[in-house]
Amino acid sequence: MAKTERRKKPRTLPAQIERAISAAEDKKALELVVLDLRKAAGFTDFFLICSGTNPRQIRAIADSVMDALAAQGAKPAHVEGYDRSEWILLDYFDFIVHIFAPETRLFYGLERLWGSAERIELAH
């Protein structure tokens, strides 16, 4: 019997999101996932969600994402949570980056709340 091969659908994400993903990965962000909200919400197209292990790493991930996108001329319209560093939100209109402490991510459960959105796993 022939073995059935599973193929992942190739991901096609906007270049700015790919850049944000790379910047987050450069700072060792954990559990990266993208939610495609185009069919589920009117206020943004995508969420990029990831975690850091401590406040310093969470800020470093946020700084890396902001620096990488600023190099391309993009600045967040809004930044929240930078000082506390339990949940930093970077709003780029078309997509929003959420950087969580693990326990905060579990508590708020964005992936669960937006369960109807297509989930794009980022295995690199």
Residue ranges and their predicted role:
Residues M1-V34, R38-K39, T53-A60, D67, ...:
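Long, contiguous binding/interaction regions
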Residues Q57-A74, L89:
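Compact, glycine-rich, soluble single-domain proteins
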Residues E31-F43, A77-D94:
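Glycine/charge-rich, flexible interdomain linkers and switch-proximal surface loops
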